[in-house]
From Swiss-Prot:
This is Single-stranded DNA-binding protein. The gene is ssb. One of its GO terms (biological process) is DNA repair. Keywords: DNA damage, DNA recombination, DNA repair, DNA replication, DNA-binding. Residues 106-161 are annotated as: Disordered. GO terms for cellular component: nucleoid. One of its GO terms (molecular function) is single-stranded DNA binding.
Length: 161
């Protein structure tokens, strides 16, 4: 049996970080996930998914992501129930996240944090350095598929089809 969920969406509110009596961090959050089709008016509707994440990833989510941040969630569906304040049973279906990926830098979220520009520049420089390293590596390796103008000698028996 398989219970696996992968979602990409935007936080609908700031994550709600709390701690259990034992000191374990838990964050509740909601994400809006666009549906892959449009309605009759041509608008794309969204589903609003309740999620929960535990321990250090919960603290990271609460510290670095805010309402509107784009995140990727990997986890599983869980249903649970509890007795509400009015004595009625309340049923909850939520995604228990194993991991949350931050899909935007702080600087791309509209300047919510004054250090966002520094972080974005640092990431950009790191990306440029990685690209320069990769291009230098590519120059050192010769293309095995480069055509030197010579016919390719291969028998029909060597072809997989």
């Amino acid at each position: 049996m398989l219970n696996r969920v992968v979602l990409v969406g935007r936080l609908t509110r700031d994550p709600d970080l709390r701690y259990t009596p034992n000191g374990v961090a838990v964050a509740n959050f909601n994400i809006a996930v666009n549906r892959p089709f449009s309605n009759q008016q041509g608008n794309r509707e969204a589903d609003f998914i309740n999620c929960v994440i535990w321990r250090r990833p919960a603290e990271n989510l609460a510290n670095y992501m805010k309402k509107g941040s784009m995140v990727g969630v990997d986890g599983r569906i869980q249903t649970r129930n509890f007795e509400g304040q009015d004595g009625k049973t309340v049923y909850v279906t939520e995604v228990v996240a194993d991991s949350v990926q931050f899909l935007e830098t702080k600087g791309s979220q509209g300047g919510q944090d004054s250090s966002g520009g520094y972080q974005q520049n640092r990431n950009q420089n790191q990306y440029q350095n990685q690209n320069q390293y990769a291009s230098n590596q590519n120059q050192d390796q010769e293309d095995p598929f480069k055509n030197n103008g010579e016919p390719i000698d291969i028998s029909d028996d060597d072809l997989p089809f």
